[in-house]
UniProtKB/Swiss-Prot annotation:
It comes from Zucchini yellow mosaic virus (strain California). The record marks 310-311, 766-767 as: Cleavage. The N-terminus of helper component proteinase is involved in interaction with stylets. The central part is involved in interaction with virions and the C-terminus is involved in cell-to cell movement of the virus. It is an enzyme of class 3 (hydrolase). GO terms for biological process: proteolysis; symbiont-mediated suppression of host innate immune response; transport of virus in host, cell to cell; viral translational frameshifting. A motif (Involved in interaction with stylet and aphid transmission) lies at residues 362-365. This is P3N-PIPO polyprotein. The keyword Transferase does not apply. GO terms for molecular function: cysteine-type endopeptidase activity; serine-type peptidase activity. A motif (Involved in virions binding and aphid transmission) lies at residues 618-620. Belongs to the potyviridae P3N-PIPO polyprotein family.
Length: 991
């Protein structure tokens, strides 16, 4: 019988039949009869069974509804499709089902059905039990004792990866005291300073000194640096370091009489005699001496003034500072110095110069130094002068030789004040109560002269500036030049606002009074997408502040879009950065038939001075129009209203075309923008001249006449870089420019006229590189490229005048016969330009005969006045006209100035400059000549060989040397071939 072990008690298990026949009476009653739980008899009535029957019917009905819902074909398909779906991670971390397509589901169902049928057939035993013999399938060569490989053609062996063994770092384990001792030994042997760091900012530098053949540790203490402390070194912080120092040093030989100045900071160990005698601590760091003996720097001293510190002697400290600063300020030596004077004389010299400029009782006294600092500059100079007078005899006795004369003279002049005030008072009486400009200038000059050596540099600069202005005025007054007429020129800006009919028409305004672009805004995308750059405010405005153009930079005020809420900072944002302000010159005006064209001139104030531009505040998403009057702000098109655009570099003139688009009819906006994009912008390119922009505006005005009255954006004139700045909605942080008065497109079109005499029409809109340098490079390049030179002769004949900067360029152009071609082209078109080419050709013949560079430059300078006279009568419609005119003017003025200097016997110091410029020009010519086309070189060489072959037949075979000389001469003329490397030349030399 089976049993169960409960602890050490075995309980038998009765069989099932026995358990079934066992009566209840045999069970043991564990619970008392009074506490036995009894089950109440169930009282189930008819209502109970009726209610349960209804619940059962409802449950069966719900099950039938659910089965009918899931038994539909659509629901079965959805369940099957969900069963075939895969889980994937969706956005925000959600888990979603990736459901297959319907075709995939049906194909999968067919595959599963076919698999079930195949499995059922297989389980029923309906399968082919035949065995296929491999010998029938494989070829005969494979079935006889040959290994058959089952590898696919893509099989590739996997190589065993080599494990890289990483070398473990070997860490040396040693106690801290042992490590410290080793470090100190290394520092001792190699004389390396060791920095000892305690708590907070407590630091001491440890060095090792040799004394009587042994090492002594020396610690830096406070009194060596001039700082007095009651306790100079904390023993608790550095006691273990002091112990380690004593282990690596030997101080047994140090006696008490060896402690002298310079021994501060020496560390003595516990067993040393001096430590036992003078220290209450285990170690002794020497500080100095007092009445009781040696003082320990580790112990507290109540009255440190009573301690005689053992630092270096005062004389040694003085000369250490003297040597350190004296060597820093000494000049570069140009000879080998010798000790010609003893130290006593050198000390006297240093003392007298020190007292002359810094008179004190003691240099170490702080009160003496403060007394010199607290006085004013005038009082300081008076005290130096008084000191100089008091010690006049000492100065005279010290002044032995003339080597000190300049020093004494400098001190005397710097300390003396102006004594003759009578003449200054007379000048003041004459100019008093006069408010004219010239009288005020004389007052400023007189004030500077009255102060004499006490005058400040700012006052002296002001006096010189006033003197310069007076000189210029007097020169103009005496010579009665044409500048006098320019001084009477006035061009005040209009006090009335300009009226634009397109902005006043009610049909083109919305309910807020803003301009409605309509179709114009849609077609403006052609300009915004191609030639404007989008400004993203989240990336900041810093990269858009500096506006580069090839001849300089200008700062935009786009950074001011971030408005500070502090009033002081807001006022600071209204200040601009000014450039050098230019006065009113002939470049500021435009004339036609001897009359001023005021709309093409710079705006002036009431007194005739030019009106300088002020800070132009920026705005977002606007088109700003209105030149010299109050600006008008037009919202950008609705499609671009949420974006900020800035024109790309070199295309700021497109703001003019956008301003013209405001006046274009909506049905013509498409043609207008397409013409700008496809025709005008490729023709203008980057940084076009104002004349070209005006011509483009004229072309647009022909096709769209309504744009002629369109208002222009603000245009600033930069005469320094010859640039026109078209200001957009981001304003300008740079101020000080002149303001162009042109307010409409009609005014701008006047710059396109050839009859208009104006320098501004050649300015670049947005900037231009230095024109003269660019034109010179183009001229040198065209010398060796005939096609390019012919194009230059037709388009810009004045460019050949730039060849007068160098005799080399003139000779090259003469040899290549460019002057002859210029005469042939222009002798019938323009007689004056043809005359210029004739003069240049005659000048080059003279220059070629001169062998010295100075003579060649003199010939060029002599021909400059005649050419300048002819140039003034020519038309200025070419881009090289202004640079060529400036070049001739500079040469004429330089020759006139140098003539007076040479007459008075002064040398001309510009010869070195001319030599270097000639070398650079020759180098540039050689570079461009090396880049000439290879075909041209081959043709020239073949022509030379053909000439030599033709003439060589008539030569006597014995006279081959003459043939070689002719060949070398022709090669040197052409400059395309080196005769020393030519095969023909070598053949002649061998013959």
């Amino acid at each position: 019988m089976a049993s169960i072990m409960i602890g050490s008690i075995s309980v038998p298990i009765a069989k099932t039949e026995q358990c079934a026949n066992t009566q209840v009476s045999n069970r043991a009653n564990i619970v008392a009869p009074g506490h036995m739980a009894t089950c109440p008899l169930p009282l189930k009535t008819h209502m109970y069974y009726r209610h349960e029957s209804k619940k059962l019917m409802q449950s069966n009905k719900s099950i039938d509804i659910l089965n009918n819902f899931f038994s539909t074909d659509e629901m079965k398909f959805r369940l099957t499709r969900n069963e075939m779906s895969k889980l994937k991670k969706g956005p925000s971390g959600r888990i979603v089902l990736r459901k297959p397509s319907k075709q995939r589901v049906f194909a999968r169902i067919e595959q599963d059905e076919a698999a079930r049928k195949e499995e059922a057939v297989f389980l029923e035993g309906n399968y082919d039990d035949s065995i296929t013999n491999l010998a029938r399938v494989l070829p005969p060569a494979v079935t006889h004792n040959v290994d058959v490989s089952l590898r696919s053609p893509f099989y590739k062996r996997t190589y065993k990866k080599e494990r890289k063994k990483v070398a473990q770092k070997q860490i040396v384990q040693a106690p801290l005291n042992s490590l410290c001792t080793r470090v100190l030994k290394i520092a001792r042997n190699k004389n390396i300073p060791v920095e000892m760091i305690g708590n907070k900012k407590t630091r001491h530098t440890l060095t090792f000194k040799r004394f009587r053949g042994c090492f002594v540790g020396k610690v830096s203490v406070a009194h060596e640096e001039g700082r007095m402390r009651h306790t100079e070194m904390s023993y608790e912080q550095f006691k273990w370091l002091l112990k380690a120092i004593c282990q690596v040093t030997h101080t047994e030989r140090i006696r008490e009489e060896d402690i002298k100045p310079g021994c501060s900071g020496w560390v003595l160990g516990t067993n040393h005699t001096l430590t036992k005698r003078y220290s209450r601590l285990p170690h002794l760091v020497i500080r100095g001496r007092d009445d009781d003996g040696i003082v320990n720097a580790l112990e507290q001293v109540l009255f440190y003034s009573e301690v005689d510190h053992s630092s270096s002697q005062p004389e040694v400290q003085f000369f250490q500072g003297w040597r350190r600063i004296f060597d820093k300020f000494r000049p570069s030596p140009d000879h080998v110095c010798k000790a010609d004077h003893n130290n006593e004389e050198c000390g006297e010299l240093a003392a007298i110069f020190c007292q002359a400029l810094f008179p004190v009782v003691k240099l170490s006294c702080q009160t003496c130094r403060e007394s010199l600092v607290e006085v004013s500059f005038e009082e300081f100079k008076d005290s130096l002068n008084a000191n100089f007078i008091i010690h006049k005899d000492e100065w005279g006795s010290f002044k032995e030789g003339s080597q000190y004369d300049n020093i004494f003279k400098l001190i005397k002049v710097a300390t003396q004040a102006t004594q003759n005030l009578k003449l200054s008072s007379e000048v003041m009486k004459l100019v008093q109560n006069h408010t004219s400009t010239h009288m005020k200038q004389i007052q400023d000059i007189n004030k500077a002269l009255m102060k004499g050596s006490l005058v400040a540099q700012d006052e002296l600069d002001l006096a010189l500036k006033q003197l310069l202005e007076m000189t210029q005025w007097f020169k103009n007054h005496m010579h009665l030049t044409g500048e006098e007429a320019l001084k009477m020129f006035r061009n005040k800006r209009s006090s009335k606002a300009m009226i634009n009919p397109s902005l006043l028409c009610g049909n083109q305004l919305d309910k807020n009074g803003n301009f409605v672009w309509g179709e114009r805004g849609y077609h403006s995308k052609r300009l915004f997408k191609n030639f404007f750059e989008e400004v993203i405010p989240s990336e900041g405005y810093t990269k858009y502040v500096v506006r580069n153009f090839p001849n300089g930079t200008r700062k935009l005020a786009i950074g001011s879009l971030i408005v500070p809420l502090n009033l002081d900072r807001a006022r600071t944002a209204l200040l601009g950065e000014s450039i050098e302000k230019k006065p009113l010159t002939s470049a500021c005006v435009s004339q036609q038939n001897g009359n001023y064209i005021h709309s093409c001139c710079c705006v002036t104030m009431d007194d005739g001075t030019p009106m300088y531009s002020e800070l132009k505040s920026p705005t977002k998403r606007h088109l700003v129009i209105g030149a010299s009057s109050d600006p008008k702000y037009i919202d950008l098109p609705a499609s671009e209203a949420e974006r900020m655009y800035i024109a790309k570099e070199g295309y700021c003139y497109l703001s003019i075309f956008l301003a013209m688009l405001v006046n274009v009819n909506e049905n013509e906006a498409k043609d207008f923008t397409k013409m700008i994009r496809d025709v005008l912008i490729p023709m203008l390119g980057q940084w076009p001249s104002l004349m070209d922009v005006a011509t483009a505006a004229y072309i647009l005005g022909v096709f769209h006449p309504e744009t002629r009255c369109a208002e222009l954006p603000r245009i600033l004139v930069d005469h320094a870089t010859q640039t026109m700045h078209v200001i957009d909605s981001y304003g300008s942080l740079t101020v000080g420019y002149h303001v162009l008065k042109a307010g409409t497109v009609n005014h701008l079109i006047q710059f396109a006229s050839n009859d208009l005499q104006s320098e501004m029409k050649h300015y670049r809109v947005g900037g231009t590189p230095t024109q003269r340098i660019k034109l010179e490079e183009q001229l040198i390049k065209g010398i060796f490229k005939p096609k390019l030179m012919m194009q230059l002769l037709h388009d810009d004949p004045y460019i050949l005048l730039l060849g007068m900067i160098s005799p080399t360029i003139l000779v090259h152009m003469y040899r290549m016969r460019h002057f002859e071609r210029g005469i042939e082209i222009w002798i019938k078109r323009d007689h004056e330009i043809g005359k210029i080419f004739v003069i240049l050709e005659q000048l080059t013949r003279k220059v070629a005969l001169a062998e010295v560079l100075v003579d060649q430059l003199n010939l060029i300078s002599e021909a400059s006045p005649h050419l300048l006279e002819i140039m003034k009568g020519c038309q200025d419609n070419q881009r090289a006209y202004v640079p060529a005119l400036d070049l001739l003017t500079i040469q004429v003025e330089r020759e006139f100035s140098n003539k007076e200097l040479k007459t008075n016997g002064y040398p001309d110091l510009q010869q070195t400059l001319f030599d270097m410029r000639e070398k650079n020009v020759c180098k540039a010519a050689a570079q461009f000549m090396a880049r000439a086309k290879l075909a041209g070189k081959i043709l020239c060489n073949r022509a030379i060989e053909a000439i030599l072959d033709f003439y060589g037949k008539k030569f006597n075979p014995a006279s081959k040397r003459r043939k070689a000389r002719i060949f070398a001469t022709i090669c040197s003329r052409v400059f395309y071939h080196d005769p020393s490397t030519c095969e023909e030349h070598s053949r002649c030399r061998r013959a």
